Amino acid sequence: MTEVKSKKPLLEAIQNGEQNIKVTDPKSLLACLVAEECDNDKSNVKKFLNVILGSKNVVDMQDRPKIRIGIVNEKGKVWRMFINLSICSTALGIIDILNDTYAKIKVEKDERGNLTGNVEIV
């Protein structure tokens, strides 16, 4: 079991073919990953989530839950999208987000201009 709590070790573990990854703070990691990748382009969000959460070497491909995600950027604009993901109950630890969950991700910039985010599961 590889435990990770930020983006760099997560990506390294995925690239190294780790089969069993536990994310210690899944909601904030997911939010930061999404915030970072999508700033103002919702197609990037979709692509990114599919790559990270749908990664074949990490995630069990049996069920394909649908997650509804709303992203609020710093201008208050909300994107809503439906994303089909391949998920198992433990992969990445992010995945107690169950079928048809609505996740609201708020994207903000901190005082240094870095994107941050938080996830609210509704």
Predicted regions and their residues:
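Terminal export/targeting leaders at protein ends
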Residues: M1-V45
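Short amphipathic alpha-helical surface micro-motifs
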Residues: T2-S6, I87-S89, L98-T101
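Long intrinsically disordered, low-complexity regions that are acidic and Ser/Thr-rich
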Residues: N40-I83
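Membrane-active amphipathic alpha-helices enriched in small hydrophobic residues
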Residues: S55, I83-I95
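Membrane-engaging insertion elements
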Residues: M61-W79, A91-V122
